[in-house]
């Protein structure tokens, strides 16, 4: 038995962790059979993606897109009329169609969070080089009741956590590999950060990972104050990381804007006449429609943020 553990321990431990995580997070995740927390908002938004209805909201669209994919794949409500979801941004329990199930909408958050524990395990294992230490710390994530309840709902955090931990794990893996840090490493990190930001804008805090990666990459030049070498490296690493990030972020918005081919109940979200005209003409995937739609979406996000009360602890 000890020989098996020594030979396959590097694989058995994370596999065991994943199995436990899937059981904890995935068992009966369709319960409760009613909406709670922000599910009332996100379910309505996800359904609009399925039906091609234009909408805007304060968060980028990737999370709702994945919820729409989950609902489509599971198909638990394929025989239910869900048109009421397109007529509101907040679906009350009374307005929800009778017999509606939430397993499809909850699928991405539940299982992406369940799988993200592998990234967390990998981060701690890479740092400590002790698989049992990594397993012990990972257990804190798996058995955190608040995290489990939050992730088993139609919420954005479980989805975003997958990309956040994925980005951190990738950075840790690169800097602990002992190999030279190359431009593709910055690019892949940029993709992962872009995905996290495309779920919620607060993912922009992960831009600090670029600074950390560059610091490790150029540590010798930093110690020796080789300013010219540092600037030359910055000139190539910044585009290498930021360009993929922007392509991911704006690419997701391009799909989001293109999918919005219909306005329901005159819910225009203060869209400009130019944007509405592209929708009427069925040209939402055109580059010009994207430019106008992106500007309108960003304005909506900014105006919504301006209306949020500022934290005052005094």
Tell where the protein language model's regions lie, with residue ranges.
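Transmembrane-lumen/periplasm boundary regions of multi-pass, lipid-linked membrane glycan transferases
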Residues: 65, 195, 214-314
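Transmembrane-helix motifs of polytopic, lipid-linked glycan transferases
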Residues: 99, 103, 107-128, 166-170
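Short helix- or helix-capping micro-motifs
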Residues: 17-21, 137-142, 149, 169, ...
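Membrane-interface transmembrane helices that cradle and orient dolichyl/undecaprenyl
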Residues: 125-128, 167-185, 196, 215-222
